[in-house]
């Protein structure tokens, strides 16, 4: 029963895709200006994604090392994964707490 439901959805989706592509092809053939704009925008997207990819390959490790430090500090230089001691409210020691001095 589930297979027929999925089959119907896939058939409808493929029908919609075919209708869209045939309509797109008709528009493409009838309007040179739309085709030129589409090619221009598609080229711009491809060029931008290529530039981003090349920049990431070049500068990615540097950016990654700035934001994800390895070592004692944990991620982003914050608290380590395992705290050295329990927080003050769970501490059983009687050490004095540091207070703000004015």
Curated annotation (Swiss-Prot):
GO terms for biological process: osteoclast fusion. This is T-cell leukemia translocation-altered gene protein homolog. Keywords: Membrane, Transmembrane, Transmembrane helix. It comes from Xenopus laevis. It is found in: Membrane. It is a single-pass membrane protein. The gene is tcta. Disulfide bonds: none annotated. The chain crosses the membrane at residues 36-56. Its main location: membrane. GO terms for cellular component: membrane. Belongs to the TCTA family.
């Amino acid at each position: 029963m589930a297979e027929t439901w999925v089959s119907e959805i896939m058939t409808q989706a493929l029908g919609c895709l075919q209708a869209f592509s045939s309509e797109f092809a008709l528009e493409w053939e009838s309007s040179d200006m739309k085709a030129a704009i589409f090619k221009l925008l598609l080229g711009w997207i491809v060029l931008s994604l290529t530039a981003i990819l090349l920049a990431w390959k070049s500068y990615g490790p540097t950016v990654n090392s700035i934001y994800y430090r390895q070592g004692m500090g944990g991620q982003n230089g914050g608290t380590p994964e395992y705290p050295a001691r329990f927080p003050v409210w769970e501490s059983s020691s009687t050490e004095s707490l540091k207070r703000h001095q004015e």
